């Protein structure tokens, strides 16, 4: 996954002292994730599973990974940021129940971004000279967004715990 790939590429990136890592997160990271944030006692959904919360939790995990990586990259010339691409015209709902899929396709066709529009923020964060040295931020529509309220998107303690858990789970693949 993201954790292994990024950690395997970091040594190469660090030889250049310049580079940007952009993580695709989502508003779902704070809108759909359960109130507990990352449920470390139910990571694989073995106790209970809700598809919407699982999606939100995965996007929260991407944002937390980006946040912790930004801390670890301080002073290296590398940066880590997370983005929300917006609602993009994709086939993400292809396996949803028929009613939900139909609603998503209709609603998405009316207000969703094209794939090119959905990629704009990711490309901006990856390439804009204006963002040189910016790390640990979250972007929507090519703008930094400050996340506030009752959520875990900026929970550095949870980000550290998630990193440690991922290291423990993936350790054999990191060397």
Task: Report each predicted region and the residues it spans.
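A short C-terminal helix-loop "cap" of Rossmann-like NAD(P)-dependent dehydrogenase/epimerase domains
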Residues: 43-46, 99-107
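Short, contiguous clusters of charged residues that form electrostatic/catalytic patches at enzyme active sites
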Residues: 64, 120, 164
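C-terminal amphipathic/interface module of NAD(P)-dependent oxidoreductases
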Residues: 151-175
